[in-house]
């Protein structure tokens, strides 16, 4: 899964996938979440495998101020509509055991006592608190920490932080999904981490705005600088690269991953106004 998803806020202008050695068979499919998956088969022996994906896309950023929530969902708690709930249930379902209710208690700390809790304020506070109170530590081993382990260690990768926030908001009744993709980091001085590798964050379903991005690693609300590649209910369903091989265990020496996200030359790729950006006017009418 390396091909970015097509959507109103990101449109593919060009995409190329190079695999060396050349596979004997290459086919594409959409998985159950609509992610683009390339399946490559090989019929010859090789000492190495290189997969290179190059993409140019048009990105329409959405900021926190452009997230508009339906009136009934602006305060927490709320209940999803009867039309949406059947399709959201699996995204609300908890994935990790929490016998001591550590995740539950941590999530509940963001709910105001004795006053109204705004939905966006709650989710924003949770995302920004992870960026502020937890330490980002790169880890190249596969898999994620459990949310409880991340809470206790107060450190982890972008995947760990995403899983923690997903489990926490699900404990509050929100529908949430795991996102794998890339983050645009033009300057390290801007404090954005997760560049140079695949990145992970969260999508939460909010009535009135649909699936909204929350990046707890960087405290980003909205899709600014975030390029979606795969969306799934669980991280294991959104692996960028997976497969099987035949050989001696000692033959596998490791894997290197490099991601480079840069701004395209506007002269070669002029804006098409395809990206849909939310806007609001003071006075408007329609029939």
Where does each model-flagged region fall?
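Secondary-structure boundary elements
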Residues: 74-156, 164, 172, 233-235, ...
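Short intrinsically disordered coil segments
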Residues: 15-17, 66-76, 216-221, 244-246, ...
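Generic beta-strand structural signal
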Residues: 47-51, 124, 200
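A structural signal for short, well-ordered beta-strand segments
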Residues: 53-55, 202, 257-259
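Beta-strand-rich, non-transmembrane domain signature
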Residues: 1-33, 237-247, 267-286
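Intrinsically disordered, low-complexity N-terminal segments that are enriched in acidic
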Residues: 1-79
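Hydrophobic/aromatic-rich core segments of domains that either
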Residues: 113, 128, 160-249
């Amino acid at each position: 899964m390396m091909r970015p998803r097509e959507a109103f806020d990101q449109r593919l202008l060009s995409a190329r996938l190079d695999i060396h050695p050349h596979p004997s068979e290459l086919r594409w499919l959409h998985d159950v979440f609509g992610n683009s998956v390339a399946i490559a088969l090989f019929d010859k022996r090789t000492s190495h495998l290189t997969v290179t994906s190059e993409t140019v896309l048009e990105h329409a950023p959405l900021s926190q101020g452009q997230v508009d929530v339906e009136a009934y969902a602006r305060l927490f708690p709320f209940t999803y509509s009867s039309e949406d709930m059947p399709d959201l249930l699996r995204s609300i379902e908890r994935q990790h055991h929490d016998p001591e209710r550590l995740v539950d208690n941590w999530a509940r700390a963001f709910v105001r006592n004795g006053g109204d809790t705004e939905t966006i304020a709650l989710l924003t506070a949770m995302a920004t608190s992870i960026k502020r109170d937890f330490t980002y530590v790169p880890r190249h081993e596969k898999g994620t920490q459990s949310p409880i382990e991340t809470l206790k260690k107060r450190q982890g990768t972008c995947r760990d932080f995403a899983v923690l926030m997903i489990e926490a908001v699900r404990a509050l009744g929100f529908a949430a999904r795991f996102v794998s993709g890339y983050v645009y980091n033009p300057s390290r001085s801007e404090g954005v981490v997760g560049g140079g590798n695949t990145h992970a964050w969260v999508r939460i379903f909010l009535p009135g705005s649909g699936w909204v991005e929350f990046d707890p690693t960087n405290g980003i609300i909205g899709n600014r600088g975030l390029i979606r590649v795969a969306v799934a209910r669980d991280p294991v369903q959104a692996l960028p690269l997976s497969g099987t091989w035949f050989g001696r265990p000692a033959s596998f020496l490791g894997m290197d991953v490099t991601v480079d996200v840069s701004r395209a030359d506007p002269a070669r790729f002029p804006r098409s106004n395809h990206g849909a950006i939310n806007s609001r006017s003071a006075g408007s009418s329609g029939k």
